[in-house]
C-alpha cells in the first residue's frame, strides 16, 4: 500500500535552514578545477567533524 493512502505527511514543502554542510575543505576538487590531494585524510576529517545539526 502506498504512503499516500496512510496519510503520510506532505514532504514537498521541506525547508532547509542555515548554511549547507558541504565545506570547500572537504571537497574533492579545488575552486580552480584541480584535484585535491590526500583523499583518505580529507574523507576521514569530513567524517569526524561535528558541525552538523
Swiss-Prot record:
UniProt region (Disordered), positions on chain: 1-53
Xref: InterPro entries: SASP_SspK
Record carries keyword Calcium: no
Sorted UniProt keywords: Sporulation
Locations listed in the record: Spore core
Signal sequence residues: none
GO biological process: asexual sporulation; sporulation resulting in formation of a cellular spore
HAMAP family assigned to the protein according to its UniProt record, in alphabetical order: SspK
Family to which this protein belongs: Belongs to the SspK family.
Protein name, as recorded: Small, acid-soluble spore protein K
Amino acid at each position: 500500500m502506498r504512503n499516500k493512502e496512510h496519510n503520510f505527511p506532505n514532504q514537498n514543502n521541506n525547508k532547509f535552514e542555515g548554511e549547507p554542510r558541504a565545506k570547500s575543505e572537504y571537497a574533492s576538487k579545488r575552486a580552480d578545477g584541480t584535484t585535491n590531494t590526500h583523499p583518505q585524510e580529507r574523507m576521514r576529517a569530513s567524517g569526524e567533524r561535528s558541525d552538523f545539526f
